[in-house]
């Protein structure tokens, strides 16, 4: 079980902790000119209306708990696992993977840190979310990460639909609309949304140079939930050099249960390891 466990750990690292980013794309390929130069007031108004329509599809729930079935593949190996996905808006994203009914790995993301807990070997790794040595100096925001898991269009805190529309570059892509938003000196996000339903179909994180920033989310299916539409099937894909890693998750028994701790309490039996030690898990 050791080799699959290493692949599981690295898939979590690559796909969820956003480690590594190597791509040859250029900024012009990813986004084009700045929104201020390219968008007219009429187009900005249309983009604001579309973003507003996407917001209307968001679920109203403040918390989500779901069972999951996952398949993780990378480094020439794959492993299937069951588990749970738990989220509280503004507080936590938790994913626990189990094998034979025993929890093996837990990933916990909160506004300040990322924690990976290895239940079998009794150790954990905790790093800061920002200024993380494993994030390739990408300025990752917790609210961006949770928007990906909730399957929602990311809106920086404090910005309404109009303000976001002034920052995006929108273009048609078949029956979808592509929205590119620069988030600062190190990061941008590209969302592909169904033009008719106004629901995100995928989202990619890019660095400021327009390069793939190690992660892409895809939303294959959604179900009515809490006044909106929540992803019931989603996939995460990551690229680290020549290796690609994927996590496909199918969710069931989705509820608004919030009766669980936002932070996992660990006993003294767990040893803390440095974040850099996870790089040794690369196949």
PLM regions and their residue ranges:
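Bacterial N-terminal signal peptides that target proteins for export
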Residues: 1-9
